[in-house]
Every structure is written in structure tokens, then in C-alpha cells.
Amino acid sequence: DWSSDVCSSDLFEKSIRVLELPQLLERLSQKAVSEAAKERALRLTPSTDADDVRRLQDETDAARALIGLRGSPSFSGVKDVREALARAERGGMLNPRELLTIAGLLTNSRRVREYYEADQGEGTVLDRMFDSLHANRFLEDKITTSILSEDEIADAASPELADIRRHKRAASAKGRQILQKIISSPSYKSTLQEALITQRDGRFVVPVKADHRGDLPGLVHDISASGATLFVEPMGVVQANNELKELEAKEKKEIERILFALSAEAAGFSEAILWDYDILVHLDLIFARGELSYQMDAARPEIRTDGSVSLRRARHPLLDPAKAVPIDIEVGRSFDTLVITGPNTGGKTVSLKTLGLLCLMAQCGLHIPAGDRSAVSVFTGILADIGDEQSIEQSLSTFSAHMK
């Protein structure tokens, strides 16, 4: 939070908009992968603590160096699991999708650790974060071997489930065998609408012509829209169908037991899982800062506390790099007031916005598009009053805006 009363006012908020920090943070957000990191990127605010700014710059430095060596780690499995874990801790049952999301987070945590451990080289400020990841392979494997997809629980999830499904297959084969004899029999050729085995309410039936209802004893489960076809469960298959329904009920109960057990396991590790989630989101944002630095061909500025700024070949980050004219700005040491004059559409506003935005960027922990030996100070407030709130992205000068 910026401490100055002036800087916490509407004027400061307006200055942030005028200097187009939100547009820059939108670009940063696009470099992040997880929704949480994207949201954090959009909410970044400049720090007024010089040590904090240097720490943030150290993080961006480390991420950019790692990206240069082996690319960014993947954060595609970083999904919000907080609500699901809170429900599991209350004794609730998580569904397969929620459990797979937790497993995906654990997989991502493990792979980020592997990324870090592959070639540690010299230590960085990110080491402590990488080292703190738990990477719970036990729970990850338990979930992924038990749940094949959002709609399918594996036979291997429990011996009981495998046994139930084996009996289910046997009962199903028995029912189909009985019905196959019926639809293959010449005796029922004129009785059946077609030689087909289908299901109604989970029970095997065959399509019987309505005017031949009495030819095949059994239970009617459905009637076609035209009324010409009855879907009949022959008496000979009732026992197999009953057995199948009982086994399906047992299967459902066993699946619920498995999901409850996996949910309880996840709840037992919730603290570590939530820690990993937060660390991964933080790393995602840090590597987004590194990626943005690469894209802008940016560099780390020297961080000062004396109120001076020294920019070498600075470029506005929202302008096309091929068209942007680099500028040098010195202020705060030999003199502390700088007046810029020049013709209309001559770049005065762009220069002022470049100065203000690059200072804001640095205090957000971002590298700035400027040359080596550039330096910025940590300010308690940066205020800007620029006519018409012209947009650099729209390349609209103050004079042109007035004419428009």
C-alpha cells in the first residue's frame, strides 16, 4: 500500500490509469498460466520498500536466467483446490474430477521439483521455494491409479470393486446369451420388431411387435412413441437382470467408499497440498515476469533510494519495439526538476509516460525496457496529470486528441 494520503486518493488511481500500468499488467497476466497467477498479476501494486523491490527484482532475475537455460517449468496443472480440500476436511466426498484436479496439482508440483533438481548449478533466490514443494507421489499415484477419468473408476481401485465387476460381466454375458438365443430363434422371427438386444432402466430387453405381445412371456418396460413396439424383458432373463441390478448397486456403493477414502487421504495432506498450490501460483507469477522480461528485451534496473532516475535507451513497453525511439532521462542528482519542450506530436508525452511507467514497473518487480546502467528510485508516490488521458497504445498525441 502506498502510504501517502495523496497517493491513496483518486488522483493516484487516475495516475496509475494515465500511465497505463493496467495495460502492462494485462500483458503480464497473459504470460501466467494458472488462473490464480493471472489474477495476482492484474492486482500487482508497486512496493515502496526498497529491500522488497530488490527482492522482487532478484526473483525476476532468477526466473529469466532459468528460462534462458532450460525454458519455463509447466504450470498447467495448477488449479484451485482450496474449496474441494475444505469439503474433504469436513468429511465430505470429493467427486472424481476434484480428486483428479488434486492429483494434477501434485503431478505439477513433482515436475517443478524435477525441473529444479535437474541442473541446480548456482543457487538462486528461488531455491527455497523450489525446495519447499512437497511433491506427494504416494497420494498422486493412489488417485491416478484409482481414477482413470472423470467418468471411470479403475478396477484396480480396490479388490472388492474388481470382484464386483467380474461378477457383473458374468451376469451380463449370461443375460445376453439367453436373449441371443431368443432373437436368433426362427420361432420368434415374426414376434420381434427386429433382432436386437437393448436396455431399458438398466435391464436387458428385446423389441416385440405390439400385436404379438402374447408370443413372448415377460415384463414390458417401455413402449415406442408410435405404440407399435413393446420393449419386453423375457422371463428367462429376469434372474440375470436382477443379479445385474444388485451388482450395480454394490458397485455404486463401493465406488462411493473408494471416493470417500481418497477424499480422506487428501484431507490428511491438505496443509501440504495447499502450501504447494500457493508456492506454484507464486512461481507461476515470477516466471511470467521472467517471460515478459524476455519478450520486452528488458533489464534489471539499479534500485536507488535518493529520488534520482537515470534511464539509458529507455523504450515505452506498450509501443511497437521496431518503431519506438529510445530515450535517455536523467533527473534527481544534478537537478530535480525536468521540463520537456518540443513540437506537437514530438514525443513529450511518451517520454513522460515512459519515465512514470518504468518506475512503476520496477517497483512491481518487473524488469524495464532500458539499457544497462539504468537506475530508478523507489518512490512513495508517482502522480501524473496528462491531458485527455491519451493512450500510448493508440498512438494518440495530446495535440491530436484536442484536434479530434
Where in this protein do the model-derived segments appear?
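Extended, Lys/Arg-enriched charged tracts that mediate electrostatic binding to polyanionic substrates
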Residues: 162-212
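ATPase nucleotide-binding head domains, primarily ABC-like/P-loop NTPase cores
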Residues: 296-297, 304-404
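Non-transmembrane, heptad-repeat alpha-helical coiled-coil rod segments
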Residues: 248-282
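Conserved amphipathic alpha-helical "coupling/scaffold" segments
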Residues: 9-160, 164, 269-272, 276-290
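SMC-family hinge/dimerization module
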Residues: 196, 200-231, 241, 302-326
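Extended, charged coiled-coil "arm/hinge" scaffolds of SMC/Rad50-like chromosome-maintenance ATPases
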Residues: 135-151, 239-260
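Short, small-residue-biased leader/transition segments that mark boundaries at the very start
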Residues: 1-8
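Long, charged, glycine-rich C-terminal linkers/tails
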Residues: 183-200, 290-313, 371
